[in-house]
């Protein structure tokens, strides 16, 4: 059949009824071919429809009689007469009337039964009158099963060794419901070869009274090992003496299947992959008299070593050099070894339950009150051998792989658990693998632990270190090849090997389907990755690193802190509860007074002892976990400085960037990548360097971008805890977590705040400069990063406790009450309303004034200044960011009639209507003043006008209609931008055009404007005109022109008349030599009236005007005419 290359006559699988199937000769037309060697017997499974004697593994249940040499029995495929129990021909022990020679136990040694090397005639065990082999206690004809030379019965080298016995319509005869002794342990309604949880009676092959072994037409079924309380029952259900084939209550453990190698081609009773068959090679068997056909009742020890098991009857259907499964094991549930040598001392049979082949009504899972089908029962029965492990089965080449069920046993695990769909517990606990899903097949979880429960979280062990997240997620595919959706990779960073990777599915069904489809393994980058379920409870959450840590880890894999300590510290950091207690004693406050430089050294320790209740910073929390011996000395101070650089306050947001401070300017990114290679895998694209260009006082910074905040924290902690300290190119580098705070926020100078507190406070008390102003203002705004110390307030001269809200006088060392000055807020508001951004000259003047006043007031405390002057100092502008300037409130102008043309003028001028209204306001002519006050007034007016062109709230230049990111850029734009200068000049011209138009209007009224001819002459002749500023080319001067008389004009032609009317003379002005014009008196006859311009006004655009100016002038003139 399947898998056999030899051509043979095949009858196909039997399709009749159960009774006809085992009729004594339904397939006797095909005698079994003789086997030439013992090796051929490995493939001689005699099944129905094969060339050899048809013998169905599932339809017989007689005692094993073949291949005793291999510690098992065979019913067919012998070189000589075959002991076929289904109708084989020739002499032998045939249970169905076949004339076959007796069963052979294949060349056993002295301690084994041998059914091969005998010369004795084997009786027919079914319908013959030959020597009986009585299994019911009768004294049958002596028949030696040990030293026979007759060929042994083997069913392995036959053509039908791959018959599928699963798809039959009707299972063979039953052990329970039939009165015949059949060898079919598969398709029955009852349980099968179940040797656990049952009261197994022994098989007694001696002291029987009947003379023949008829296993077919009996009133009582043959093998009933169940529901008997240890009573010894023969093959017909009769009680007898001590039993031979007892699988329970033995003192010595029997062979175990644990630690075997699974044969990949085992035959199955149902055409599936099976474990190896029972192997009795090298077993110790009791001596048997070769002259008798009955089993000698051995001692208990011998019986246990003999390995005589009910399963041996099933082994007879297989060869004995390759392992085969036991009764009912039709699902390939074991992993077996190729050989069994001396493993008869396996698990004791006390751990087993007996099997019932006849009258049992439920499978091994009696406690579940569920009756399984024949296949399920046999699969359950198979699990029983995990504990007993007494038998080997051989020959898995003839397996039918069409309907396999991947339930298997891993004997390497303790207890030899069986893997089912539901990841059931092992059978010693009384559970079945098919309780929940008993209809599902093809489940193979042989790579996972048996106790694990399915969960949505699957752990991948052995993932390549360089595997990306996309490669890992794409490795999970649906059956149609599509990537699995809604997959989440838990805490994985490319380039780091944590030993495992966890993938979370959105649905439990998806996770189970993944395990089923991949059978516990997955290929990622040509590397096999192991899959296993992981309970979510196995992970614990590190609040400090914000990462899930494996349950097997007692410390965080990122911050390296213990689980308990990390959680405790994080609770304090995340949820600080400062207690507003009373001010400590003066001696406790003394360290915070930077009166002497010597106070700086014990400051951390004393502060830590006296202000434990006001810890809000991580630096203080870290000190609490240090031993007292480490809280002293320069090492502790260096650690405090290093911790202060980290910037890990609870106010800081998560950051993925590490900052390296004080590196060399010449350090390239490659060096940083190389130095950090032992701790993190980087590329030069992850490193940025900001070089110091301010001289020796500045620092060069390096920034390293990582994948997550937890990873950045981990690297920062590692680098900060190095001893010796972390250095690059021989220079010690400060490492901290980069926070994205601006310089005017709480992060400003945060790296200097704690370590240099003493120095700053010392300068502050002396009244010193910008640092004191900055620090006091920062603390006054509540942005001081350290909340566990007193803050010097330069406005009062006292030290301020921001938590308690009290002031402390350093001189008296007592608390003082400072009343709030009611005048301060108003003056601060006035200062906020003062314009702080002026033009170029005003900005310089303001800066010079501030610098001068700062030098003058240095050395005097703010408290004294306020006491004497009663106003805020001028340096307050440096204490905080410059606020946006509010426009100076002016009294609203009186309402006036607004012409709609004003909007049009605003559009042309590029300004708003509001600004145009201000421009239209005509101030009265100023009274004559002295030069100096007039100059000062003009400058103030100029500054006010420029302020009107700037919106300090929106940081926008209204003149250029541009907005800027900050105030400094806006000021630079006003001072340096050419565009702003051009627009400002145009704006000034527009403002001046008012006076110019008024002057022109007066001239028009006085009749001083000339006509069109006068304009031409003025352009060509009047070189002294102030409006004439550019002449591209000069023509002849007035001295070159020859004034002609009226007589020269020829009036006879029309052209002459025209020339005469316009003032030209004949012969002049027509060529290049006489381009002159007639006198102005001759042009007075021109009609004056409305033209391009207003009546009596010239329409000429002035030479210094742009087109926009000209249009504005004309429109303004028309507006005046309307008034």
Curated annotation (Swiss-Prot):
The modification Phosphoserine is found at residues 17, 240, 360, 362, 891, 1022, 1025. It comes from Homo sapiens. This is RNA-binding protein 6. Residues 79-97, 115-131, 145-237, 245-286, 301-323, 332-354, 366-391, 431-454, 597-654, 742-754, 843-860, 934-948, 1004-1051 have a biased composition (Basic and acidic residues). One of its GO terms (molecular function) is DNA binding. SUPFAM superfamilies: Pentapeptide repeat-like, RNA-binding domain, RBD. Residues 456-536 form the RRM domain. Ubiquitous in adults. The modification Phosphothreonine is found at residue 344. Changing residue 353 to F: In a non-small cell lung cancer cell line. It comes from the Eukaryota. Residues 910-922 have a biased composition (Acidic residues). GO terms for biological process: mRNA splicing, via spliceosome; RNA processing. Residues 1-391, 413-454, 574-654, 741-787, 827-948, 1004-1106 are annotated as: Disordered. There is a cross-link at residues 36, 331, 386, 453, 469, 569, 871, 879, 887, 935, 948, 991, 1019, 1042, 1046, 1066 (Glycyl lysine isopeptide (Lys-Gly) (interchain with G-Cter in SUMO2)). SMART domains: G_patch, RRM. GO terms for cellular component: nucleus. Residues 98-114 have a biased composition (Low complexity). Residues 356-365, 772-787 have a biased composition (Polar residues).
